[in-house]
A protein has these predicted regions:
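Flexible glycine/proline-rich, aromatic-decorated loop/lid segments
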Residues: 195-211, 421
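Acidic, glycine-rich active-site loops and adjacent beta-strand->loop/helix elements
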Residues: 91-93, 152-161, 184-189, 212-215, ...
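N-terminal helical capping/dimerization or prosegment-like subdomains
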Residues: 2-99, 326
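Active-site metal-coordination/substrate-binding segment of hydrolases
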Residues: 82-153, 444
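A common structural junction motif
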Residues: 92, 239, 243, 349-358
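An extended, acidic, His-containing surface patch that forms the Zn2+-binding/catalytic region
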Residues: 80, 191, 247-326, 334-347, ...
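Acidic/histidine-rich catalytic neighborhood of metal-dependent amide-processing enzymes
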Residues: 124-199
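A short core secondary-structure module
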Residues: 166, 222-243
């Protein structure tokens, strides 16, 4: 089998008129901010997606029942016995905050040095347009699709898909019974293998707040008065061992352990190593788990307790000798199958009370269940075999990823085999500055999706 080099793929991309037409669409899409957390641009971008999919020949419904409009675009096969595949994507992005380093304007698609840069180019607007390009490339040489293709695009994925369950329930009759659902995105890993995964972790996020007094107090009382800062730090410390495991009674007993195939897939394919993580992030502290087998088990199959940020006391220039009266932290627990967000928060509340920290206030912010698959469904196995034709280094098949998304919500609603693969890379920098994809990977994804369509002929 002959595989194209990166240079050859870029040349093919540049000579492909359909791909070039849709790069103009991607450029316009990235220029339109759509940030759920700030309630910016959701209606405009959903409407723009409706317009481009109608122009591409799809039947489109724009459902505005909830905060972020839900876009459904259907390319219906004329074959009455045709199967259906669904692409799940989202059009919202995280902000491009001022503390992020961008070489160019994040909302202007930049093409340089074999890559494309811009907010959402990987997560997730680039995937929408690449997959739409694949449909159009097939229809350029065929009168009809051999399979019905449905795109579902939400606008709140970066905020725990707050209304997705309601949208799916509303449109269940249209979406139920599909042969396959292709998830929003994926990467080519550092070894050049396409990662094909079947799940993701869940999450529960919450704020922890402490108020120790009506006002800040002079620090001369530090020997006899407990400050909000110390109370919060001690409360947080009581919930985690030094090795990173969570100290909450009854939590691990609810975890569903992976089956033998899931364990075998991670052992065979997971390329993330302690050494790679240390190098990529320039770690200054020792890893909580450095032995590779346990390291991977932690990443894929165990929950984790994480502090996103802590706020308390004086942070200005110089010194202010006080005992802070208030302290707060933003906290998350990454979940695995068996753990339900609200139940986890209840266990944490109970543990804090038992540990003597009953003055801590917990405020739930969002939650999402986890989902995991052993990747044995026939339609998923077909994707794995098709992908091997396009990636010289082969594929990496994983039952889950360490990230979070609404896979559980979608599976519970639609009961369809789900698989994630995409056009990102190990350094795509999603949510960070200079978010990017490689042009060759972008075009290879287009070709693979087109080949998936061909496989239904």
């Amino acid at each position: 089998m002959t595989f194209s080099s990166e240079e050859e793929q870029i040349k093919r991309f540049e000579e492909d008129m359909v791909a070039q037409d849709y790069i103009a669409v991607l450029r316009a899409l990235i220029s339109k901010k759509s940030i759920f957390a700030q309630q910016v641009g959701l209606q405009e971008v959903a409407t723009y997606l409706k317009e481009i999919f109608i122009k591409a020949g799809a039947e489109v419904e724009l459902d505005e029942s909830y905060t972020a409009p839900f876009v459904i675009a259907k390319f219906k096969s004329q074959n009455p016995t045709a199967k259906t595949i669904i692409f799940y994507n989202h059009y919202d992005t995280v902000p491009a905050d001022s503390d992020q380093i961008w070489t160019d304007d994040p909302f202007t698609l930049s093409i340089r040095d074999g890559g494309m840069y811009g907010r959402g180019v990987d997560d997730d607007k680039g995937h929408i347009i690449a997959r739409l390009t694949a449909i159009q490339k097939y229809l350029q040489t065929h009168d009809d699709l051999p399979v019905t293709v449905i795109f579902i695009m939400e606008g709140a994925e970066e905020s725990a898909s707050v209304d997705l369950e309601k949208y799916l329930e509303k449109h269940k009759s249209l979406l139920h019974g599909a042969d396959l659902l292709v998830w929003e995105q994926g990467i080519k890993n550092s070894l050049g293998q396409l990662e094909i995964s079947g799940g993701n972790k869940g999450i529960v996020t919450f704020d922890i707040k402490v108020k120790s007094a009506e006002v800040d107090i002079h620090s001369s009382f530090g020997g006899v008065i407990d400050s909000a800062s110390w109370y919060l730090i001690n409360a947080l410390t009581s919930l985690r061992n030094k090795d990173g495991r969570i100290k909450v009674e009854g939590l691990y007993e609810q975890v569903i352990t992976p089956n033998q195939r899931e364990l075998a897939l991670v052992e065979r394919y997971a390329q993330r190593s302690p050494e790679e993580v240390e190098a990529i992030y320039g770690l200054k502290l020792p890893l909580l788990q450095a032995e590779k087998k346990d390291f991977l088990n932690r990443i894929f199959f165990e929950p984790s307790f994480n502090i996103e940020g802590i706020t308390s006391g004086y942070q200005g220039q110089g010194v202010k000798t006080i005992l802070p009266a208030e302290a707060s932290a933003k906290v998350e627990v990454r979940l695995v199958p068996g753990l339900e967000p609200h139940r986890v928060l209840e266990l944490i509340r109970k543990q804090l009370d038992k540990n003597g920290f009953d003055k801590v206030e917990l405020i739930y912010t969002l939650g999402e269940m986890s989902y995991r698959s052993d990747m044995s469904a026939p339609s998923i196995l077909k994707v794995i075999e098709l992908a091997k034709k396009f990636y010289k280094k082969g594929v990496s098949v994983l039952p889950t990823t360490a990230g979070t998304g609404p896979m559980h919500t979608v599976f519970e609603a639609l009961e369809v085999p789900m698989v994630a693969f995409g056009l990102g890379n190990a350094n795509s920098r999603d949510h960070g500055g200079d978010e990017n994809v490689r042009i060759a990977d972008y075009y290879t994804h287009i070709e693979l999706v087109e080949e998936l369509i061909v496989s239904y002929e």
